[in-house]
Amino acid sequence: MDVSLLLNVEGVKKTILHGGTGELPNFITGSRVTFHFRTMKCDEERTVIDDSKQVGQPMNIIIGNMFKLEVWETLLTSMRLGEVAEFWCDTIHTGVYPMLSRSLRQVAEGKDPTSWHVHTCGLANMFAYHTLGYEDLDELQKEPQPLIFLIELLQVEAPNEYQRETWNLNNEERMQAVPLLHGEGNRLYKLGRYDQAATKYQEAIVCLRNLQTKEKPWEVEWLKLEKMINTLILNYCQCLLKKEEYYEVLEHTSDILRHHPGIVKAYYMRARAHAEVWNAEEAKADLEKVLELEPSMRKAVLRELRLLESRLADKQEEERQRCRSMLG
């Protein structure tokens, strides 16, 4: 076996089990990548969580399309066709896996993955912990851990090799489509149709990212597109907050802030997501940053801080009540 560390990727180790053929495929933005995967725990039994071959349906993702588990794009773009490789991924990359897995299982069971409802009660409320409907995924969500992904790369299709409406547009048409998609996303959001709104924002982001690949990074035109992309990503995150997809919000907002540390809305959204998953200190730090960068948001920041303190007090009271009941 050929063991190698993926360069410039913290918390990822790769082991090639079967070498692929030819050169690395051209993974351009918009390429559709088809692959089989098996997800395992890092315990002695290498407990299998999901296996696409057992489902009988390979997985596919679109490069640059904000796939929930962003590290998979990194893993796949290191592979050749036919290659089988095992990737150990640290917890920093696997926090959103339970939500992805839930969606994949819902699809495999013939259910609509957007129709599920979040339920909280009793002990679950105490930890602000939402059931995903699968016991093993609930456990993973409560206690994130490193995971192993066994991946077999089957196919890479360029944007013009499969049917995707966005790619039927030329550059000028793509740019014209962006404000229309943005506006439609806003309209759907106001109607409370958050899944559909998120899809519109994603389509607009894909258009812009494709245009951005034609510009020199960090120059004027590239930065103009980057600003538009960040605005749409934050709109997308607003939908995720409504859908209670808090860990994905943390990923997207943190990624924006790594490259653009002055975006106030990203700090504000990340603070709200941190608060929902009981990262109280992180939430407070982000809210303080909002206040530092935008003093005019003082009223909104104080409201969020009061809400956080109230929820923390409720949680502590539930814990006290639980301890009393356990002691009889």
UniProtKB/Swiss-Prot annotation:
GO cellular component: cytoplasm; cytosol; nuclear speck; nucleus; photoreceptor inner segment
Domain of life assignment: Eukaryota
Tissue: Highly expressed in retina.
GO biological process: apoptotic process; negative regulation of apoptotic process; phototransduction, visible light; regulation of opsin-mediated signaling pathway; retina homeostasis
Record carries keyword Repeat: yes
Classification via Pfam families: PPIase_AIP
Location in or out of the cell: Cytoplasm; Nucleus
PROSITE patterns (UniProt xref): TPR, TPR_REGION
InterPro entries, per the entry: AIP/AIPL1/TTC9, PPIase_AIP, PPIase_dom_sf, TPR-like_helical_dom_sf, TPR_rpt
This protein's UniProt keywords: Cytoplasm, Nucleus, Repeat, TPR repeat
Ranges of residues in domain PPIase FKBP-type: 53-145
Main location: cytoplasm
Renumbered ranges of TPR repeats: 178-211, 230-263, 264-297
A GO molecular function held by the record: peptidyl-prolyl cis-trans isomerase activity
The protein's assembly and partners: Interacts with NUB1.
Known role: May be important in protein trafficking and/or protein folding and stabilization.
Official protein name in the record: Aryl-hydrocarbon-interacting protein-like 1
